[in-house]
Amino acid sequence: MSKEDFYNQGMEHFAQDRLDDAVAAYLRALDDDANYADALHALAMTYAHQEKVDQAIEIGKRLIEAAPEDELAYTSLSIFYQQKGLIAEAEEIAAKARTLGWKRQLSEPKTPTKS
């Protein structure tokens, strides 16, 4: 099976609330590609749903290293920090997410407005 197959399998397990099976599938995907951003994000979110916030933070940090321009990755990590009660860290990471969002908006072509 490919990393995408394991990721999709993990998503199916997650949807069925089989979180341990989802974690196992995401880890298999990451065995194929340690920087597979979709699997890292899904794994972090699954850990958060299991209330394993320390693991969610650890994987969230890996996700940001793997996908440094992904504003959703920063937003998720900020939420994990909030869940842990690390408000200063959450605010710092949330600011980075906002900055990435602004950069994205500024780089998008402007569509002319009709009068």
Walk through the language-model features, giving the residues of each.
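TPR-adjacent "capping" and linker segments in tetratricopeptide-repeat scaffold/adaptor proteins
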Residues: 1-5, 109-114
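Alpha-helical segment of the N-proximal tetratricopeptide repeat
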Residues: 2-28, 32
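Structural signature of tandem alpha-helical TPR/SEL1-like repeats
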Residues: 15-27, 50-62, 84-96, 101
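Short, charge-rich amphipathic alpha-helical segments embedded
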Residues: 28-50
